[in-house]
């Protein structure tokens, strides 16, 4: 018997068949759930009772692109709104490889050990090619996902940042209504996603790694300005010395920026999420921030300003969507693009023409 035949005969065929059957059963169960008529009032009550399944289903509705769900979504959010706005919203950013998932898991477990309920969401406007997600498989946070007081939700991806951000913000409200005390919003750490997360959270945390004296290279000025704290992760073993040097460098850089309106001076902390070192100090620092900003009134004012921002953003998104879905505009665009390519018109003149065309309808 050949080695290939030997290997083939050694496969656990029964186990494979069982796995296939389980997958088919799960798929059929999901399809059946989707076919069920949505009992909105029941769903709302279950969310308020802290039911994770109901919360997941409501967020799935929010992420839906189908117009038939719009009415239900509005009802759910409106009913949950009076029970929201009671959590601490923390944005966490950092480039890939900085250890965000490990940090979030360690941080989440620390919060749960102190009696908190933790929800983890993500803002990840990934391309339609990969359709990936920051969080991806929940097994990346295998300890946290098993906790009764934890809720982890990879965001829908493959669409515009505006769409993902709006849905994430609405998901925050639902998580708060479901009783979660701390909402962690993770971002991919590239593009404009940090700005979106900053506009929907109370505290913005930047994760960094210690390098070889080039810690400040490649960091966008805006990220430093937004950060309420910088945590140098993986500060353990042989990295300790480099991490301490990086801390000095970041502190020096932060002092060059003007004081913030919130009365808070951004801090730099060392941590090792893998070894669970320094995580408690990060939470103590964040708790101090909330004490400071609630006492001076900045916390409430920032929430109000964020709501105004999202009002304007929602109007802009709706106008943009209506513009591109207009049939007259759809028909006119190819010719406009041709004229721009041929240098027969300017983008500004073309835009004015299209807007006039829209107003005539």
Residue ranges and their predicted role:
Residues 1-82, 330, 334-335, 351, ...:
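Non-catalytic terminal/linker segments enriched in charged/polar, low-complexity residues
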Residues 40-45, 98, 155, 231-236, ...:
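Short hinge/gating elements
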Residues 55-57, 270, 281-358:
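Long, well-ordered amphipathic alpha-helical subdomains in the mid-to-C-terminal portions
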Residues 134, 171, 196, 200, ...:
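Alpha-helical scaffold elements adjacent to nucleotide-binding pockets in ATP/GTP-utilizing enzyme cores
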Residues 197, 210-241:
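Flexible active-site lid/hinge loop adjacent to a nucleotide/diphosphate
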